[in-house]
Design a protein with these regions (language model features):
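Glycosyltransferases and closely related glycan-assembly transferases
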Residues: 93-106, 115-129
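Conserved nucleotide-sugar donor-binding subdomain of glycosyltransferases
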Residues: 76-108
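Active-site-proximal region of nucleotide-activated glycan assembly enzymes
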Residues: 27-28, 50, 123-134
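Conserved nucleotide-sugar phosphate-binding/catalytic loop shared by glycosyltransferases and other
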Residues: 1-6, 21-86
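Short beta->alpha connector loops at strand-helix junctions that form conserved
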Residues: 54-58, 109, 130-133
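Short glycine-/acidic-enriched loop or helix-start segments at secondary-structure transitions
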Residues: 10-13, 40-43, 64, 116-119
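Short amphipathic alpha-helix
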Residues: 9-21
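Residue-level detector of alpha-helix initiation sites
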Residues: 7, 111-113
Length: 134
């Protein structure tokens, strides 16, 4: 299970995890969050989650209201380049983590961390489900 960055991502993950544990008590449910996420202690404390891991992630800033100005904004572009490397590192970390964990399925809920985990899962041939209740 992966997602994070806000309670809006984590809360549905925990609800799905609790229901899965009711229906499949022997299922091993693992949460993969974003490295440095201040909310990672929430899934770690939940009894439905058996283990918590973290990987690098980043985002691409694309502010439509700024138009052409954003394209030439060096700070925005520098942050995008930095986060591209974070995403690539996250895919690499996720690939090896998934190889070790050998999950049958990946459940993604959104947030920046979902991208590297889902991409690594896809490259590894692991099916994934994307949940969006918004």
């Amino acid at each position: 299970m992966t997602g994070g960055g806000s309670g809006g991502h984590i809360t549905p993950i925990l609800a799905v995890a609790a229901e899965l544990k009711k229906q499949l008590p022997d299922a091993r449910l693992v949460y993969i969050g974003q490295r440095g996420d201040r909310l990672s202690d929430i899934p770690a404390a939940d009894p439905s989650i058996d283990a918590v891991y973290s990987v690098s992630a980043g985002k691409f800033r694309r502010y439509k209201s700024d138009g052409i100005k954003q394209i030439f904004d060096l700070k925005t572009q520098a942050l995008n380049v930095r986060d591209l490397f974070r995403i690539l590192a996250g895919i690499w970390q996720s690939f090896w983590l998934l190889r070790r964990l050998r999950p049958e399925l990946i459940f993604t809920r959104g947030g920046f961390v979902s991208v590297p985990v889902a991409v690594a899962g896809r490259l590894s041939g692991i099916p994934y489900i994307t949940h969006d209740s918004d």
